[in-house]
Amino acid sequence: MACPKKKTSKSKRSMRRAAWKRQAALQAQRALSIGKSILTERAQGFYFPEAEEENEDEQE
């Protein structure tokens, strides 16, 4: 026969929520840092293609 599970305490719930929010804030900070480096053209850790539309106009 199925028995009901015990209720999760408020402290455990708040600890899990705080850990989740901490991880989300760290990811947001990293994304903002990458965006800033792309805008200032100082990004060296990854490759992103140049705009192809400009090259097509020059060839015609």
Curated annotation (Swiss-Prot):
Residues 1-22 are annotated as: Disordered. Transmembrane segments: none annotated. The keyword Ribonucleoprotein applies. GO terms for biological process: translation. InterPro entries: Ribosomal_bL32, Ribosomal_bL32_plant/cyanobact, Ribosomal_zn-bd. The lineage of its organism: Bacteria, Bacillati, Cyanobacteriota, Cyanophyceae, Acaryochloridales. Belongs to the bacterial ribosomal protein bL32 family. One of its GO terms (molecular function) is structural constituent of ribosome. Pfam families: Ribosomal_L32p (PF01783). This is Large ribosomal subunit protein bL32. Residues 1-20 have a biased composition (Basic residues). The keyword rRNA-binding does not apply. It comes from the Bacteria. GO terms for cellular component: large ribosomal subunit. Keywords: Ribonucleoprotein, Ribosomal protein.
